Amino acid sequence: MINKKQSLTLLSAIALSVSLSACSVFDWLIYKPDIPQGNYMEPQQVEKLRIDMTKEQAEYILGRPVLRDSFADDTWYYVYHYKSGRDASITHKELILHFTGNKLSLVKGDYELSPEFNTPLEQSKLPMVNTTESAPQVPAQRPDEKPLVKENQTEAQVQKPIK
């Protein structure tokens, strides 16, 4: 038969095992933040890249790279690493720019380049912008000729003479 000391030991062992297993049962209740690291880039940004761009132009479009080779400044690394807090999925993307002199010569990585990448920026056509708005009109040219803003009196008109 089980005595009092054995039953107390058995009861404490059961309580300990139940309390430790509770940590894993309620794991889905614990908030885990998403962890983004590096350069997040939209595909539209990468599509703006053109061959023979200068380093300044590439940096203006993509931002500063995560890593520049300290011995050869002709290779720039843009790395994006994202770990989801909910399902622990990991997204990893890289974009590597190679420059010859000060001009962009090669792009490698996980992003798709524009079909116009091999057309230098000086030779590419700018998109047409259709504007339906007309140029601003001066009051004499507007149909109603009323001022758009109510004019206040100037300080000279408001001040009273000093006695």
UniProtKB/Swiss-Prot annotation:
UniProt feature, compositional bias: Basic and acidic residues: 142-153
Signal sequence extent: 1-22
Keyword Signal assigned: yes
PROSITE patterns reported in the protein's UniProt record: PROKAR_LIPOPROTEIN (PS51257)
Subunit structure as annotated in this protein's UniProt entry: Part of the Bam complex.
Membrane topology, as annotated: Lipid-anchor
Subcellular location: Cell outer membrane
Role summary: Part of the outer membrane protein assembly complex, which is involved in assembly and insertion of beta-barrel proteins into the outer membrane.
Organism domain of life: Bacteria
Organism this protein belongs to: Shewanella oneidensis (strain ATCC 700550 / JCM 31522 / CIP 106686 / LMG 19005 / NCIMB 14063 / MR-1)
Lipidation (S-diacylglycerol cysteine): 23
GO MF, any single term: protein-macromolecule adaptor activity
Name of the protein: Outer membrane protein assembly factor BamE
